């Protein structure tokens, strides 16, 4: 049904909706006009952040979407973020800020994985919330994350839906009970941790590097810095047909190359650097030897030039250039430009100055992509835009060479290389764990307590899980597990064999497992004196079974595979000579009990050592329980002692 409103299905795509509450307008045309005004206000309000942002594939955009199938008319946007996941989380920040700036708007956001906000906060979700019942429950309201809960008991809260709500039902609940549906502090903290630092974080995600580029590309990037993303993607996703256009360059001749500074996102820079590529000899692009100080600048420029040439080769040689004048002819452009001026987008620049025109060009381009016709055929492709700029922008190669002599220093790219310690720190920050005290790694390893391993494993084994699988203990302070001993022994009676007055059936009834379904249903029961005596006798029988099994296994290879405690002294012969136990145990030592903790720790350490520093079952299981083993130093190469 449309009312469930399943969103993004395309890979690496995020979709977002903004609803107006209360929605009292009955006139669809009037409602459309209201929402169009909101789109204009939102884009202009956040233009200082959105316009200069370099998007991996598609920018943040909003358009009017009419009501259909019970879903009211709303503002809708879709962005393909590709390999740069930071684009998606920046959009989450923008959506959060929109609902904060405009309290009458409610937003929901999903990607092709579904409710990815819940995935981010998976460690803190209530047990009832799962992918099957989370539809239309997660919204942003007043700048805060809200989750519409399910009723814990039938009839507890009449306004809570027992099934996933429809969009109209969800909007009504948010309107009437916005304070009661606020997500828990831990869930909100997990999401806020992911978007912490914006908008300042935008600058931290950029990387400036020197590139040896044709003059035409330098001029284009001065006017449209965001086109670097399209060029990198064209090179990164090239195929043999694309490279045919790069055998002989027709648009960007290598003879016109000059040094310039290019701003990438870190994702784009990494994509460009990590690919090995040898240009065709006929292209005219020659690289200096790798030892040359400017080798990296030449290599980056060569790759980027191939991307721009591929983009231009996909355009018709006679494409219409009338599209470039359609931006300022749009009826929305005048009001959009006026709103930009009111929001101090131009930062007090003098109208007509070079910097003013540069920001105006960026605004026109963003208006075309995000406001006027984000999915229209009138929108120019990147290649058409590049060719249009080459035809309309005058540039002087000599002036560009003078600018090349005074370039700002490029950024250090050491962030491309991560040490194991830095990787561990990033993983800990990703799950919200930080070391509160500055203890050296050597001190931690020396003071490491192996009992933490055994205690964590015991807690895991003691946790009663459901049919959905094993559950890791969430907190050490969790209540102890209750246990129905009577039901447990009845269960073992059927496993070990029937009593003389019982049938020989090996089948277990469904009710025999009910006591093991959930730790919430198990509890101690009070027994009558007769029942307690019977229970004690059953326990004694079970112990005798286990003792006999131990004696039989004591002389096999199985017993040698375990580490035992110190051997127990031989049983005194002066005890009751008529005892039945003397027949099998006289003159022999009682089998020493297995040291469970020592065996557990030694087996885990052996498994951890065999991982050779890679991921494996031992480290994965322990880390999921919050136990971090120190590095295995036994296999590290050590320097040989020198002779005096």
Swiss-Prot record:
Where is the region Disordered? Answer: 430-449, 496-537, 567-589, 623-644
Q: Which GO terms describe its biological process?
A: fibroblast proliferation; mRNA processing; positive regulation of transcription by RNA polymerase II; regulation of G1/S transition of mitotic cell cycle; RNA splicing
For this chain, the Swiss-Prot or TrEMBL PTM comment says:
Phosphorylated predominantly by CK2 on two serine-containing clusters; involved in cell cycle regulation activity.
Segments for region (Involved in nuclear export): 481-497
Phenotype upon changing residue 510 to R: Increases transactivation activity
Quick one: effect of changing residue 572 to A? Greatly impairs in vitro phosphorylation by CK2 and impairs cell cycle regulation activity
Residues the record lists as Phosphoserine modifications: 503, 505, 518
Q: Which residues form a coiled coil?
A: none
Q: What is the effect of changing residue 489 to A?
A: Decreases transactivation activity
Q: Predominant location of this chain?
A: cytoplasm
Annotated localization: Cytoplasm; Nucleus
Residue ranges with Basic and acidic residues bias: 431-447, 524-534
**Location of region: Acidic region required for transactivation activity:** 502-532
| Resulting phenotype, residue 518 to A | Greatly impairs in vitro phosphorylation by CK2 and impairs cell cycle regulation activity
Q: Which InterPro entries match?
A: Ecd
Homology family: Belongs to the ECD family.
Name of the protein in question: Protein ecdysoneless homolog
The organism of origin for this protein: Homo sapiens (Human)
Query: Lineage in the entry?
Result: Eukaryota, Metazoa, Chordata, Craniata, Vertebrata
């Amino acid at each position: 049904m449309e009312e469930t409103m399943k969103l993004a299905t395309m890979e690496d795509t995020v979709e977002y909706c903004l609803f107006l509450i209360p929605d009292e307008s009955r006139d669809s045309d009037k409602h459309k006009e209201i929402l169009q005004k909101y789109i204009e206000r939102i884009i202009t309000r956040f233009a200082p952040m959105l316009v200069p942002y370099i998007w991996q594939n598609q920018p943040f955009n909003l358009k009017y979407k009419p009501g259909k199938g019970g879903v009211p008319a709303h503002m809708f946007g879709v962005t393909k973020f590709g390999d740069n996941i930071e684009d998606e989380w920046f959009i989450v920040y923008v959506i959060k800020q929109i609902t904060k700036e405009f309290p009458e708007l409610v937003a929901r956001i999903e990607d092709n994985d579904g409710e990815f906000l819940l995935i981010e906060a998976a460690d803190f979700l209530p047990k009832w919330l799962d992918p099957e019942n989370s539809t239309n429950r997660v919204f942003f309201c007043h700048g805060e994350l809200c989750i519409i809960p399910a009723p814990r008991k039938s009839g507890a809260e009449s306004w809570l839906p027992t099934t996933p709500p429809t969009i109209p039902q969800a909007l009504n609940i948010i309107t009437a009970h916005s304070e009661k549906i606020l997500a828990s502090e831990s869930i909100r903290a997990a999401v806020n941790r992911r978007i912490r630092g914006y908008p300042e974080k935008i600058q931290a995600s950029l990387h400036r590097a020197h590139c040896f580029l044709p003059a035409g590309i330098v001029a284009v990037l001065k006017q449209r810095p965001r086109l670097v993303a399209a060029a990198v993607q064209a090179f990164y996703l090239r195929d043999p047909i694309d490279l045919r256009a790069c055998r002989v360059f027709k648009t960007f001749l290598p003879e016109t190359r000059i040094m310039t500074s290019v701003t990438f996102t870190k994702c784009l820079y990494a994509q460009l650097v990590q690919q090995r590529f040898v240009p065709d000899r006929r292209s005219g692009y020659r690289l200096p030897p790798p030892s040359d100080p400017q080798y990296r600048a030449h290599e980056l420029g060569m790759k980027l030039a191939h991307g721009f040439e591929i983009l231009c080769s996909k355009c018709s040689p006679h494409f219409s250039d009338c599209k470039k004048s359609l931006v300022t002819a749009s009826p929305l452009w005048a009001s959009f430009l006026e709103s930009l001026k009111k929001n101090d987008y131009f930062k007090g620049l003098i109208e007509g100055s070079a910097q003013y025109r540069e920001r105006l060009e960026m605004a026109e381009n963003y208006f075309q992509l995000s406001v006027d016709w984000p999915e229209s055929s009138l929108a120019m492709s990147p290649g058409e835009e590049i060719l249009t700029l080459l035809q309309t922008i005058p540039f002087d190669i000599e002036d560009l060479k003078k600018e090349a002599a005074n370039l700002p220093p490029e950024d250090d790219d050491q962030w491309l290389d991560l040490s194991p310690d830095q990787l561990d720190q990033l993983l800990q920050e990703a799950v919200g764990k930080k070391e509160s005290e500055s203890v050296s790694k050597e001190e931690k390893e020396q003071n490491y307590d192996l009992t933490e391993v055994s205690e964590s494993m015991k807690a895991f084994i003691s946790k009663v899980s459901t049919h959905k699988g094993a559950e890791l203990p969430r907190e050490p302070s969790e209540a102890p597990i209750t246990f129905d001993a009577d039901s447990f022994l009845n269960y073992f009676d059927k496993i070990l064999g029937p009593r003389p007055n019982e049938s020989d059936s090996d089948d277990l009834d469904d009710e025999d497992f009910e006591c093991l379904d959930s730790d919430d249903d198990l509890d101690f029961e009070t027994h009558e004196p007769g029942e307690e005596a019977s229970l004690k006798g059953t326990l004694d029988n079970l112990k005798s079974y286990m003792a006999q099994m131990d004696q039989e296994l004591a002389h096999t290879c199985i017993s040698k595979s375990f580490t035992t405690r110190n051997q127990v002294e031989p049983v005194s012969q002066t005890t009751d000579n008529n005892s039945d136990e003397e027949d099998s145990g006289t003159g022999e030592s009682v089998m020493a009990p297995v040291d469970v903790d020592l065996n557990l720790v030694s087996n885990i350490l052996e498994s951890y050592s065999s991982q050779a520093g890679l991921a494996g079952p031992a480290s994965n299981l322990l880390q999921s329980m919050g136990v971090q083993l120190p590095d295995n130093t036994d296999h590290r190469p050590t320097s040989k002692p020198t002779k005096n």
